[in-house]
Structures are given as structure tokens and as C-alpha cells.
């Protein structure tokens, strides 16, 4: 069985992601050990909270995560885990991210829409990629976030409309580093299919 490691860096609802992967047919481990991370067939970077706190917690693992990404093996960031894959964030103060995918994390502009975006919204699939195999355009997934990813079209796997169009899912140029702003582990059958697709990529 493929070895998938959920990275434990002090932030994130690890158990819900673990349960989601188990429902997708995997037996994931939770670890913050660099050797275990590098030995994995695939890794998941979860995250709930503030960008600046996440980057502080990730300092001991930055080199490990960069090395894993360079290896070409699949990596998936979820929610805040997608945001930290980017170059920078304006949350709190301008803070550098892991810079595995070029782009910025920005606050939703003031509008009549409530921030954070919390609940179900539909996504538009923008690229033919294994992560979205069998996912119909317009599928609904579950979001909870106040900041969004602004990145180039070639890095956008799926988009979402919430006052503006933003990257609901991202990918690097190699195709192995991916992120979802939504929570696949909370997105019903659609999210389960996305997690299964990730497991199949590993």
C-alpha cells in the first residue's frame, strides 16, 4: 500500500484529513519527522489558522518540503496548506510562503458578501489533471477562508467565484505540487473522489 504522510507541524485538523484519506482507501500516517516525510509516496499539508503562524511552525520543515516537492512525488496542501505553497501572503503583514508555486494570498475585498466565505460553493475545473479526474465542472465543495490565492492561469486547476474569481485549486509547473482552498475531507462524495485521485497519483 502506498505510504501517505500527513505533515504534523502544529496547525491543522489532522484527524479529519486522516479519516478522509482512510475513506479514500489509504492508511495515512501523521508525522513531522523529516525522514518519514521524505520516505513517503505522497504527503498532505493541512492547515487551519493564520499564515504567519503556519510559516513560523514550518521553519524546521521548509528544506524537507522543498526537497520532497523537487523529487516529483505528489504533494497536496489543503486550505491554509494551499496558501503556504504560494510566494507570499498579506495576512497580518506581508509574509513569505514556501514559494513552491508563484502567487499571492490576498484578503477578499470589501463587498456585500460575508467574509470568511463559509459553506458550499461550486468550482470550475480549468485543467485536465489527475487530481480532478471524474470531477464534473460545477461540482460543489466546502470552503472556510478569509483570504484567497491570486496566481497565473497555468497554475490554476480550478476556480471559484466569491465576489471575484480566484484559484480554488493550484498546481506547480511539474504537476506534482497541488493545493485545494476547499476542504476535500468535508466535501462529501466530490471531496472523497479528489482524495482517491490523490492516492492513485502516489
From Swiss-Prot:
Record has Lyase as a keyword: yes
GO MF: glutaminase activity; imidazoleglycerol-phosphate synthase activity; lyase activity
GO cellular component: cytoplasm
Annotated keywords: Amino-acid biosynthesis, Cytoplasm, Glutamine amidotransferase, Histidine biosynthesis, Hydrolase, Lyase
GO-annotated biological processes: L-histidine biosynthetic process
Pfam families, A to Z: GATase
SMART domains to which the protein is assigned, alphabetical: GATase_5 (SM01211)
Alphabetized PROSITE patterns for the sequence: GATASE_TYPE_1
Entry keyword annotation includes Transferase: no
Metabolic or biological pathway, per its Swiss-Prot or TrEMBL entry: Amino-acid biosynthesis; L-histidine biosynthesis; L-histidine from 5-phospho-alpha-D-ribose 1-diphosphate: step 5/9
Stretches of the chain forming a coiled coil according to its record: none
Known EC number: 4.3.2.10, 3.5.1.2
Reaction(s) this enzyme catalyzes, per UniProt: 5-[(5-phospho-1-deoxy-D-ribulos-1-ylimino)methylamino]-1-(5-phospho-beta-D-ribosyl)imidazole-4-carboxamide + L-glutamine = D-erythro-1-(imidazol-4-yl)glycerol 3-phosphate + 5-amino-1-(5-phospho-beta-D-ribosyl)imidazole-4-carboxamide + L-glutamate + H(+); L-glutamine + H2O = L-glutamate + NH4(+)
Top-rank lineage group of the source organism: Archaea
PANTHER family found in the cross-reference section: IMIDAZOLE GLYCEROL PHOSPHATE SYNTHASE SUBUNIT HISH (PTHR42701:SF1)
Subunit structure: Heterodimer of HisH and HisF.
The protein's name in its UniProt record: Imidazole glycerol phosphate synthase subunit HisH
This protein's encoding gene: hisH
